[in-house]
């Protein structure tokens, strides 16, 4: 490669790296550090109250059971979106659900730095029949995953409305994660 071409390539790479926010670079490199930067402290999750396990590892994938929004006091948010919760409150519930999933994932792996990427998410929203902004609700979760894992937090996703969810929680999300080799 000619010297001029190498210089052009290096300049372009520098521009690309400078255009990526520092927080996204940190997130991709070290999600554990990124959680600290965000002020998020993961707790040890309570054991399931039904006959299932929170996570199953198969090869380099981890399948996480559905989780709901747990408030700071340890209680679930309860109610229907469009009745007890506004869109913004429901997005916050989805974010809290993301924290619950990260707690379950860390309990399974011991270290979130083992995560290569978030692969697939199913977001379920307990909403009144006329509510149709399910995808916007689940953005509360998806935004958190990108904040924590950078571009590796972007994922395939379905967001659906439900007539009810266990314990009358407003949001339940399940997730599939790929691990580093």
Where would I find each of the regions flagged by the language model?
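Short, polar/acidic, helix-capping and beta-turn segments at strand->helix junctions
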Residues: 24-181
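Bacterial N-terminal signal peptides that target proteins for export
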Residues: 1-11
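Bacterial N-terminal signal peptides
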Residues: 9-19
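Short, intrinsically disordered, low-complexity terminal segments
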Residues: 5, 19-24
């Amino acid at each position: 490669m000619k010297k001029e071409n190498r210089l052009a390539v290096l300049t372009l790479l520098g521009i690309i790296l400078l255009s990526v926010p520092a927080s996204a670079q940190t997130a991709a490199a070290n999600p554990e550090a990124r959680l600290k930067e965000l002020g998020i402290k993961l707790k040890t999750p309570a054991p399931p109250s039904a006959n299932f396990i929170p996570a199953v590892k198969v090869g380099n994938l981890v399948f996480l059971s559905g989780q709901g929004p747990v408030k700071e006091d340890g209680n679930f948010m309860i109610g229907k979106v469009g009745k007890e919760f506004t869109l913004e409150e429901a997005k916050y519930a989805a974010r809290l659900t993301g924290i619950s999933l990260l707690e379950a994932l860390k309990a399974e792996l011991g270290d979130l730095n083992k995560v290569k990427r978030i692969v697939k998410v199913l977001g379920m929203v307990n909403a009144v029949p006329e509510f149709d902004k399910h995808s916007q609700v689940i953005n509360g979760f998806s935004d958190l995953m990108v904040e924590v894992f950078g571009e590796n937090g972007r994922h395939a996703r379905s967001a659906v409305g439900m007539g009810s969810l266990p314990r009358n929680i407003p949001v339940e999300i399940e997730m599939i994660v790929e691990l580093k080799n």
